[in-house]
Curated annotation (Swiss-Prot):
Top EC class for this record: transferase
InterPro entries the UniProt entry points to: 16SrRNA_methylTrfase_J, SAM-dependent_MTases_sf
Protein name: Ribosomal RNA small subunit methyltransferase J
Gene3D superfamilies noted in UniProt: Vaccinia Virus protein VP39, YhiQ-like domain
Compartment(s) of residence: Cytoplasm
Source taxon at top rank: Bacteria
Keywords: Cytoplasm, Methyltransferase, rRNA processing, S-adenosyl-L-methionine, Transferase
Gene Ontology CC terms: cytoplasm
Gene Ontology molecular-function annotations: rRNA (guanine-N2-)-methyltransferase activity
Gene coding for it: rsmJ
Catalytic activity field: guanosine(1516) in 16S rRNA + S-adenosyl-L-methionine = N(2)-methylguanosine(1516) in 16S rRNA + S-adenosyl-L-homocysteine + H(+)
Pfam families: SAM_MT
Binding site for S-adenosyl-L-methionine: 105-106, 121-122, 175
Protein family per UniProt: Belongs to the methyltransferase superfamily. RsmJ family.
Length: 252
């Protein structure tokens, strides 16, 4: 993939090696840039910037502070919609594969509750952002040990590469990117950056079959309320929220 590669830190060697490993090629004409920089505490982090719309800000993964820390401490916990959708109950914490991990937010909610979550991410830039955020979180004194136990990024880029006989879990969770309505305003500025990078998930339908093969209990698909069923396959039932629904396919 071609993207601007910018290093603002003193030691670019690791950044260069990571980019090479993930097939990223520096393109000085690209408006999207993967940047290795310093955060407010002086720690090295990776972030994504849209250079022609700097006001949108950078996209990065931070499980320790900011919105994710607030959600962990003051969010709904087991009452969150994603927790109900995967079937969390008193005394039952399913094992989960998040096959479209993205920035890891839903997976982090489940991991914070106590689920063991394995992550798969197909886009190389998003995978690097997620890997970087996890590594920084693993080193945190408050949540590092919990996340090392409960959130693991798998060394595959698609769940079709997993073996149902060896890698099965209770729940497979899917949240593929879906185009916004043409006239709708994007709620979050960072989503404009993220969607410009990833675009619509045109092969999302190909996720359902391997997901069903890996899930012992259910497959959960998060969709906008206006989106059709994944792979045109009707779920056993759905859970609806204000703007989304969770389509649930039972497997056992």
């Amino acid at each position: 993939m071609n993207i601007q590669l910018i290093c603002e830190t003193e030691n670019p060697e690791k950044f260069t090696a990571l980019c090479t490993q993930y097939g990223l090629v520096h393109d000085p004409e690209s408006y999207l840039a993967l940047v290795q920089t310093y955060d407010e505490q002086g720690q090295v982090r990776l972030e994504l910037r849209k250079l022609d719309e700097a006001k949108l800000g950078a996209v990065f993964v931070d499980f320790v502070a900011g919105a994710m820390a607030h959600r962990r401490k003051f969010g709904g916990g087991r009452g969150e919609a994603v927790a109900k959708a995967v079937g969390i109950k008193s005394g039952y914490l399913p094992t989960v594969i998040d096959a479209t991990a993205g920035l890891g937010r839903d997976a982090f909610v489940l991991a914070s509750i106590g689920c063991r979550v394995r992550l798969v991410e197909r886009h190389p830039v998003v995978r690097l952002l997620l890997q970087d955020g996890l590594q920084r979180a693993y080193a945190d004194s408050e949540i590092g040990e919990m996340l090392q136990q409960n959130m693991q990024l798998l060394p595959v880029s698609h769940i079709a590469q997993l073996n149902p006989a060896l890698d099965c879990v209770d729940v497979v969770y899917l949240d593929p990117m879906y185009p916004h309505k043409p006239k709708s305003a994007l709620v979050k500025k960072e989503m404009r950056v993220f969607q410009h990078l990833v675009g619509a998930d045109l092969d999302a339908d190909n996720l359902l079959e391997p997901a069903l093969a890996l899930a012992n209990k259910r497959v959960v698909v998060k969709r906008p309320d206006y989106a059709p069923f994944l792979a045109q396959q009707s779920p056993h039932f759905s859970r609806e929220t204000k703007n989304h629904r969770f389509d649930i396919y039972l497997t056992g």
